[in-house]
A protein has these predicted regions:
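Glycine-rich beta-alpha junction loops
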Residues: 43, 124-126, 196-201, 238-240, ...
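Short, well-structured beta-strand/strand-turn elements
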Residues: 36, 304-318, 383-388
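Oxidoreductase and adenylate-handling cofactor-binding alpha/beta cores
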Residues: 169-189, 202-214, 256-263
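N-terminal helix-loop segment corresponding to the beta1-alpha1 unit
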Residues: 1-175, 179-185, 368, 374-397
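Mid-domain beta-loop-alpha active-site segment that forms a flexible
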Residues: 162-177, 196-204, 247, 251
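Conserved Rossmann-fold dehydrogenase catalytic segment
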Residues: 153-161, 184-200, 219-226, 268-271
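Aromatic-enriched alpha-helical interface/lid elements that frame and gate functional surfaces
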Residues: 230-306, 310
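Terminal low-complexity tails and localization/encapsulation signals of metabolic enzymes
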Residues: 1-12, 235-237, 318-397
């Protein structure tokens, strides 16, 4: 779909963002067709330099964007950025509270100059007692209930991906699109905000309500009583783990018939799902012993044939060879912009939607630092000699 007209084509977004939350918002808008311009300091978004578990941040969340490097503290740099903002429909930022105001690019100042601007802040917290605290995905998970629900009792555990950061970026994109639709009716922009803590609390809503409904403390996932009798990971004869779920009465009959468990199917004490959940201490050892005699491939094939919920336990690197992702075009090549492998090609996952039956593609590789500085300055009316002078004075890079 990269060559077709995209839904947000013609919308310009200027982003002052780093790490994951802010860039993921821009990624959503960029993949949907918006022109997203990443404003970076002269030495680049520090996310470019991250290693270890942060090495994938920049190339993953910055495709389909343009990069301009500017000294935001210089007079020339501020003039450039102000012109860039005046050309934009949307501004996004995820710096510490107050940082944009100190630079002269806060909402109050810009909304007076450009009432139609949609200004989106992505922060740790919405307005309230916590709003000036530094916020991270990790802190939101810890104080928002997710770490408690993920680890066993007494051992809170961070989820295995930056779920709050990415979700916060998506919620911000939703808010921006809502504000854009409203602007078509009113002609005015507005200030919108997304926050890590609140989106984690939103995730916890189902468990908060669970506690109200049951009148009991909510138990973390590893230690809780499952909602269904068979809803676990099981080890196969070749040492692998496979998840299998049996979540309806119909599936229970199919499961028992196919796996030779006629005694369990006929047992009146296991007729309903609540009865089977109560009998898990009896049911699970039987199922565990049964699956331990099967290989992983045998169990997966049988569950797929029966239409039962199942899943192999997959590592991130295994996804590159996933037959479904490969067959549906879910993986795409990008050029790595930084680090020891700069210039090499790597695969990344696409935005997980289709429009008109087609995936959203990559129009621009993750940019090198200042890759589009000259192009954007020319669009803003700077002559080639002026750009040369700005580069020589280190106002831009």
């Amino acid at each position: 779909m990269a060559e077709s007209r995209l839904p947000l084509q013609g919308i310009r977004v200027v982003e002052f963002v780093h790490v994951i939350m802010g860039p993921s918002c821009g990624l959503v808008l960029a993949d949907l067709g918006a022109e997203v311009i990443k404003v970076e300091p002269l030495d680049g978004d520090h996310t470019r330099k991250l290693t270890a578990s942060g090495a994938g941040f920049f190339p993953t969340f910055n495709r389909n964007k343009k990069s301009i490097a500017v000294d935001l503290k210089s007079k020339e740099g501020q003039e450039i950025v102000l012109k860039l903002i005046k050309s934009a429909d949307v501004l996004t930022e995820n710096f510490r509270p107050g940082a944009m105001d100190k630079l002269g690019f806060g909402y109050d100042a810009l909304s007076k100059l450009q009432p139609e601007l949609i200004y989106c802040s992505l922060k740790g917290f919405l307005a309230g007692p916590y709003e000036n605290r530094a916020g991270l995905d990790e802190t939101a998970q810890m104080m928002g209930g997710l770490a408690y629900m993920t680890g066993p009792v007494g051992r809170p555990l961070r989820a295995g991906a930056s779920v709050n950061d990415v979700m916060g970026g998506m919620f911000a994109a939703i808010a921006i699109l809502a504000a854009y639709v409203e602007r078509t009716a009113t002609g005015r922009g507005q200030y919108v905000k997304s926050a890590l803590f609140e989106n984690c609390a939103f995730l916890m809503g189902q468990h908060m309500t669970e506690g109200l409904m049951t009148g009991k403390p909510v138990v973390p996932m590893p230690d809780r009583i499952r909602a269904w009798a068979v809803y676990d990971t099981f080890r196969t004869s070749d040492g692998d783990l496979v998840f299998v779920g049996v979540v309806t009465d119909t599936q229970w009959k199919i499961f028992c018939d196919a796996f030779g468990l006629a005694d369990l199917l006929a047992d009146p004490a296991l007729k309903t799902n609540p009865q089977r959940v109560e009998a898990r201490p009896r049911v699970i050892p039987i199922v565990t012993a049964l699956f331990a005699k099967m290989t992983k491939s045998e169990l997966l094939a049988k569950c797929e044939k029966l239409g039962l919920p199942f899943a192999p336990i997959t590592r991130p690197e295994d996804l590159y060879e996933d037959p479904h992702l490969k067959a549906t075009g879910g993986l795409v090549d990008i050029r790595l912009p930084d680090g020891e492998r700069a210039g090499e090609t790597a695969q990344t996952t696409l935005f997980p939607i289709t429009l008109g039956g087609e995936r959203l593609g990559v129009r621009l590789n993750p940019p090198t630092l200042g890759e589009h500085t000259r192009e954007l300055l020319a669009e803003l009316g700077y002559a080639s000699e002026q750009v040369d002078a700005l580069l020589a004075d280190s106002a831009v890079a």
